[in-house]
Amino acid sequence: MLERIAITVPIFPVKRNNPLLSEHMKIWLWNTSPWLWAALGGILIGLNAPGWHTQLVGLVAHLPVMLMLEQVRKCHGSFGKRLLLAILLCWGVGGVGAMMSAHWITNSAHVFGHLPWVVSMGITGMGYGLEVGLLLFVLHAMPILLLRSGRVWDLPVRLCWFLWVDTWYPRLIHWNFGGLTFTQVPLLEQVADLIGASGMALFSIGLSLWLLLLWRRAVEGQDISRRVLGVGLACYFGLLGSGIGYGAWQQSDVVGHSSGTPLHIVSVQPNFSLRKLASNPDLAYSERIRNFKTLLADSYHALSQPPESSGVPRLLVWPESVFPAAFFKNPETRQAVSRFAREHQTAILLASVDWSGTPGNYRFQGISVLVGPDGQVRGRYNKIFLIPFGETIPLSDWFPGLAQLLRENIHNLSEFEAGREFTAFSLSEQLRLSAPICFDIFAPDTIRNMTRNGSQLAVNLSNLAWFGQSTASDNMEAVLRWRAIENRTPVLFASNNGRSVLIGADGQSLSPRLGLFEEGVISTTIKLTPRFSFYREYQEWVNITWLVLFLGLLWIGHRQENLLNGW
C-alpha cells in the first residue's frame, strides 16, 4: 500500500531575479525521501539528549522532522494513507533517537533482562521509540495533516500548538525538548520559572519554524518576501534577547541574595554497585549489613569536619538503596540509625521500603524517612512516581493477562503502591525539606507541590547503579536543574553511584559533581529562603495562555490563508 505513494515533482511558479538556490538543487531537495529526513531527525534528536554534550543541536533537530512531514503532505493518496505514513515515519524518528539517547534503558534490558545486546537495543528502539514517535506525531504531524498549508500563518499556529501540547501530553517519563536543548545555557534557562522547562521550546522550535519558512521561499518557490522573513527573524531574536536579559537579572538576584536559614549538608556517595544485588535478591543479609557498617564509617568520617559556624543544624543524606533493611520493620537497624543521629547531633535522611496488608496481599511502598538529631522519626514520604516495568506494570488493570506474562518472564519485576501526599518534612521551625525518590522528579508536579507545601530544599534520593556506565545520571541531573529553576528551590541530587551534586535555585552547581562509580562526599553549608516562582504558582495559567494563543492565531490564520480548509 505504502509503496504506491509518490512524491509530486515541483512546479516553481515564482521567478525571482536573485534565486536563493539553483533549480537543480531545488528539485533534489524537494524529492529527498522522507525516510532520509526521518533518519536525520532521529540522529539529531538523539544527540539532543544529555550525555553527548551536543544538546544545542536541538535548535535545529526538529527541522528534518518538519521537512519529512512536508513531504508526506504532498504525497498522492488518501488521508488514511498519509496518516499511516506519518505515524510510521515518526516512529522511525523516535526509534533512531531512542537507540541513541536511551542507552540506560538498553543497558538495563541487557544486564537485568538477560537479553542479547542487539535485542535490548531493538526493544529500546521499538518500545521507547514508539513513545517518542507518538509524541512527535502529536506535536508535529497532527497540525500538518489537519491544517491547510499556508505561506506564513500556519507556522505560529504550529508553534503555539507545540508549546500547549508539550505541557500536558502524557509520557511514561516526563521530559521535554526545550529543556534538553538549553539545559546548560544558564542565562536562557532562567525563563523556566516563567514558562517552565517545556516552554523553552519557544526558542528551539521557533527557530526551526523560521528555517522552514526560509525553505518555502528557497526550495518551494513560495512568494514570501524578505520583509516577512526579516520580521520573523526580528521577532525570534527579540524573544531570545528578552529571555537572556531576564536570565541575567534573575541570576544576579539569586547569587546576590545571601540571607536565609543556614543548613550544613553532608551527602555520602558510597559507590554501592547494585548489579550483584539487583540480579540476586537473595544476596546474603550479612553482606548488606557489611555495606551498612561501611556507610556508617564513611558517614562518621564525613561528619568529623564540623560546619564553619557553630550551632548550624546538620543533615546527613544517604541515597536510595544503601540502607539494608525495611526501616519500620527492622528494629535493630532502625535503632542503629537513631543512635547514630543522637551521638553526632545530625538529622539523617534515607530511603527504604515498607509494606502493609496481610501475607499474600501485601502493598509495598518506596519511602523516604527523616530522623531528627534527637533520634526520633520526623516523618515519612511514600514515593509517588513508579518506574514503568521496574516498580509497576502500566495498564495492568486493563491487560491482566499481559501483566501476568510480564511478571512470569521479567526478572526482579516489582509492583509498588504509589503515594499520594506531597510531603514536606519539618527539620525545625525555620527549616522544611522534601525527599522525592529517584524518578519522582520526572513528574513536574512532585517538587512543585512539595515546594508549595513549604519545602525549601528538595533532596532527590536516587539509585542509578543498576543503569551501569550510561547516561542515566546525566538525564537525572538535567531534569533536576529544570525543577530547581521552575520552583526556585535548591535541589540535592544524592545518588548511590554518581553523579551527586548540589544545585542552586538558579540551576547552577553549588558543589563539586562527584564522579560516576566513585566514592565521595558532598559537605557544604547552604542558606535556605523561600523564593517566588511565577511558573510554580501559576503553571495552569501558562498552559491556558498557550491554548488561547493557539486558538487566536488559528482564527487569524484561517481568515488570512483559509488554514482550516473546510473543517
Range-by-range predicted roles:
Residues 2-7:
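Extreme N-terminal basic, low-complexity initiation segments
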Residues 20-253, 468-469, 483, 495-506, ...:
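Membrane-embedded alpha-helical bundles of multi-pass enzymes
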Residues 49-66, 97-104, 269-270, 311-326, ...:
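Short, conserved active-site loops that position catalytic residues or coordinate cofactors/metal ions
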Residues 104-124, 138, 146, 168-197, ...:
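Active-site catalytic loop in hydrolytic enzyme cores
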Residues 120-125, 273-283, 406-407:
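Short glycine/proline- and acidic residue-enriched helix-loop micro-motifs
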Residues 159, 315, 322-323, 329-350, ...:
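CN hydrolase (nitrilase-like) catalytic-core segments centered on the catalytic cysteine
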Residues 247-389, 424-431, 435, 439, ...:
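Soluble catalytic regions of membrane-associated enzymes that act on cell-envelope
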